[in-house]
Amino acid sequence: MNEPVYYITYTSRLSMRYFLDTQVIHELCEQAHHNNQVHGVTGFLLFRQGRFLQYIEGQRDAIKQLYSNIQRDPRNIDTQILLEGTRDERLFDQWAMHCVDMAQHDSSEDMSRSFAKFDPQTWGEDKTCEVLHEIKHFYEHSKTPLNDIYPPQPISYVGLQVRALARQHSSFMMLQVAFLLAALCVFGVTYLL
């Protein structure tokens, strides 16, 4: 009989001292992918606006050690386990570590509104299970791996915040640009006369 698969779903936040580092997410994903392959760990990492949700599964000792390392990593703060337990088989046996930039999801219809408000630290067990179910469904039915659709972008947390604000308020900003151009035209005509 096979040993049960141990899993942890946890949330954390990016430490403020890494907000301007444009490579921190890419480095986290590369490091996680490599280490997970070595230790037989599978799962995924979702991130958005400095918040993380990670699901890891594998042999109990490997998962416990990995989670201990994550808690000591200075890039993570406010680490909190949302779900923990065992199951008969892996949910994501082909994913050494899929990293998904949820900010890329804003304009996509690929996933449901489960991700509309990505704030895992406020989620209870039901919401966390709903998100796991959504990712599992996508994993089983998508022809394109999730991280190929939403790859990590080489941009800092501050850059992501500015991009999100610009996307959210693009109509207002376009109107302001139109007013500025009109004012410049009026000023230019007045100045020339």
Predicted segments with their positions:
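Charge-rich, low-complexity N-terminal segments
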Residues: M1-L193
